[in-house]
């Protein structure tokens, strides 16, 4: 986020006129504490989402306890894996906070997030479709578009959970070797 608190509030009021569902991390993140976000949340006309850079369940619990966000966004690649995202989503659910796992980057992270969404305790996030929300980067990215064979496919705005073993994808070992350090 790059907004000041005042500008974030102005933007949120503007976006509300277009029926936006939430606003994600509008202010700079200076630490896992997300200073100022609990104050911002109290003034927001839209649900406030954040927590994509959380590195532990303890950091997530602190934000949930502070009510810093309406929607917590743990990322499996940063917070300790799929099991930690499920744990954090259970903590959130117990506190009345929604959980939309964050997902940005490579095929492997996308596959892990899709599998995790199938595990979260309550898929009814209050969206009109009652389906989990998957954040899916569409920018050009060789790590997302070639690292795995059998990519996660989007059809009519939906993703099916792969049924193959593991994450449901096969890693392209040649590409991994190409980028190995």
Label the predicted regions.
Residues 141-181:
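C-terminal extensions of enzymes
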Residues 5-22:
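Alpha/beta enzyme core
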Residues 13, 19, 27-49, 53-158:
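Shared catalytic-loop signature of beta/alpha-barrel
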Residues 1-6, 49:
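Active-site mouth loops of central-metabolism enzymes
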């Amino acid at each position: 986020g790059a907004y000041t608190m005042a500008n974030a509030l102005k933007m949120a009021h503007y976006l509300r006129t277009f029926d936006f569902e939430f606003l994600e991390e509008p202010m700079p993140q200076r630490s896992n504490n997300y200073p100022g976000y609990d104050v911002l949340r109290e003034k927001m006309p839209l649900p406030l989402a954040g927590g994509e850079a959380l590195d532990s369940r303890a950091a997530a619990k602190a934000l949930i306890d502070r009510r810093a966000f309406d929607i917590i966004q743990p990322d499996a690649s940063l917070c300790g894996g799929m099991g930690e995202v499920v744990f954090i989503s259970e903590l959130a659910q117990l506190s009345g906070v929604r959980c939309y796992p964050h997902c940005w980057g490579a095929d492997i992270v996308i596959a892990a997030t899709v599998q995790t969404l199938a595990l979260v305790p309550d898929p009814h996030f209050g969206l009109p479709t009652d389906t989990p929300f998957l954040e899916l980067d569409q920018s050009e990215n060789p790590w997302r578009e070639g690292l795995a064979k059998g990519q996660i496919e989007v059809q009519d705005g939906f993703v099916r959970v792969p049924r193959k073993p593991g994450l449901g994808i096969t890693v392209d070992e040649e590409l991994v070797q190409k980028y190995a350090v």
